[in-house]
C-alpha cells in the first residue's frame, strides 16, 4: 500500500489522489511521477517532524519506489532537466521553512510546501498554461491548514 493510501493519510488529505489525477491530465507516467513524489515527500515530512510513526518497511519501500520512478519513469526521463531543479527547489524550501526564525514561522508552511510547484509544473508540461492555471485554482486551496 502506498504511504498516502493509508486510511489516516487519506483522512488528512482526502482530495490528494483525485487532484493528482487532475494534474496529470490522463498522462499515466506523469501521474505515477507526481503520486510517487506526493507519497515520498509526505513520508519524509513525517519522519523529520516525528508527528506520525513511520515503519522501516514504509520508509524503505517509499525510498525504493521514488528512486525507481526517478530512474525509469518515462515522463520524468523526458522532462528531467526541468523537473530536477523543481525537486531541488522543493527540498531547499523545506529546509528554509524548517530553519525559519521565530519572527518568520508564519511563512514556514508555505515554504515547506514547495512541492506544490512541482505539481503545477507537471500540469503545465502535460496540458499547457490553461491546464496549469485551472489545476492551481483547485490545488493551492485544497488544504486550509
Residue positions per predicted region:
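All-alpha prenyltransferase/terpene-synthase fold signal
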Residues: 1-145
Amino acid at each position: 500500500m502506498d504511504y498516502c493510501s493509508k486510511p489516516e493519510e487519506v483522512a488528512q488529505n482526502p482530495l490528494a489522489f483525485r487532484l493528482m489525477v487532475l494534474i496529470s491530465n490522463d498522462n499515466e507516467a506523469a501521474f505515477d511521477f507526481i503520486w510517487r513524489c506526493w507519497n515520498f515527500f509526505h513520508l519524509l515530512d513525517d519522519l523529520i517532524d516525528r508527528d506520525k510513526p513511520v515503519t522501516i518497511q514504509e520508509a524503505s519501500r517509499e525510498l525504493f519506489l521514488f528512486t525507481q520512478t526517478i530512474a525509469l519513469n518515462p515522463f520524468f526521463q523526458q522532462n528531467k532537466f526541468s523537473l530536477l531543479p523543481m525537486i531541488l527547489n522543493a527540498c531547499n524550501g523545506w529546509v528554509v521553512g524548517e530553519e525559519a526564525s521565530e519572527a518568520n514561522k508564519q511563512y514556514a508552511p508555505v515554504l515547506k510546501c514547495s512541492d506544490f510547484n512541482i505539481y503545477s509544473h507537471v500540469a503545465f508540461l502535460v496540458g499547457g498554461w490553461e491546464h496549469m492555471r485551472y489545476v492551481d485554482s483547485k490545488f493551492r486551496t485544497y488544504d486550509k491548514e
